[in-house]
Amino acid sequence: MSYEKLLERFLTYVKINTRSNPNSTQTPTTQSQVDFALTVLKPEMEAIGLKDVHYLPSNGYLVGTLPATSDRLRHKIGFISHMDTADFNAENITPQIVDYKGGDIELGDSGYILSPKDFPNLNNYHGQTLITTDGKTLLGADDKSGIAEIMTAMEYLASHPEIEHCEIRVGFGPDEEIGIGADKFDVKDFDVDFAYTVDGGPLGELQYETFSAAGLELTFEGRNVHPGTAKNQMINALQLAMDFHSQLPENERPEQTDDYQGFYHLYDLSGTVDQAKSSYIIRDFEEVDFLKRKQLAQDIADNMNEALQSERVKVKLYDQYYNMKKVIEKDMTPINIAKEVMEELDIKPIIEPIRGGTDGSKISFMGIPTPNLFAGGENMHGRFEFVSLQTMEKAVDVILGIVAKD
């Protein structure tokens, strides 16, 4: 089904810079997310007929309710999307609307080309309306497509009171892209039987498995001596960082893994001879493999310290989130409902693990099973991001179908 305001709504949202800040200790981490919630989304939610619309300063979530129109439908269902965008330029986003007929797409005057040679997924969108960047920013379909889809579905239901649906809660939250958005999620306030994050990618994605995730921060303490007289005296902290990295399995990196394979990812390295720091993320699906990965990192550091006869490798290892499969597989109702709706709409469900995490990973372990639905974005987190309007429309269709199921 086509929805009159869906594209307009999406374009309005993405033009607002809501990039999160990993270095901030505030909640949300940027004022722009607060402003987006209070000056754009909250008035719109109230205007379309949502009730009890309220912003929670304690966690940065904007929440509203669409009351049920049927006593027959017993479930209370939530839909959640995040307001922030990823760590890429989000200032002066200028979307392009392209009626795609194949071939390359010039991204404004940036000199960048969105080409099916580099991104074969473009070949899935011949004849569709694509929204792209101008090559200078990301787009923000992750996850403003999800927000636009949820809002459009709620507006449709509010304007069609004859449609039977269950009680619906809507939540728009902050800071998902930096992994802390759901840390303070208020389960009691949201009060649903189960929920969905609308934060997935291509048409049909339906996901209830995520990585289990840990962060690893290492500090290497060296001893700087003039290199001309350094023999048996200098300890080069940068070399220690390299030595640590070389002991990790070289084929277990993001660029060499897929499907259910885990990895170690070195994403930051800095320092001098005197001190160096490296930061990793550790990811795996099965609990036993996740524990083994963390233990290997600790063992390497311990062995290096033993060889150096002092604690020159300092380890900070902490869990970030866990595979929500452990929660959701206890009751597959939200998966079964979404799958049934997709099949009724002639959408093929793509049930695959997320090689990442969602807010649903944490929310599921807080007590609300929260799998992930497609929102349409492709090539997310950069200048080559795009989304199909037709896929967004189908996401709205799926939301409408879910809330009408018993």
Swiss-Prot record:
Catalytic reactions of this protein: Release of the N-terminal residue from a tripeptide
Catalytic machinery residues: D84, E176
InterPro entries noted in UniProt: ArgE/DapE_CS, Bact_exopeptidase_dim_dom, Peptidase_M20, Peptidase_M20_dimer, Peptidase_M20B
GO biological process, any: peptide catabolic process
Per UniProt, Zn(2+) 1 binds at H82, D142, D199
Q: Which HAMAP family match?
A: Aminopeptidase_M20
| Similarity comment: family membership | Belongs to the peptidase M20B family.
Q: What is this protein called?
A: Peptidase T
What is the species listed in this Swiss-Prot or TrEMBL entry? Streptococcus agalactiae serotype Ia (strain ATCC 27591 / A909 / CDC SS700)
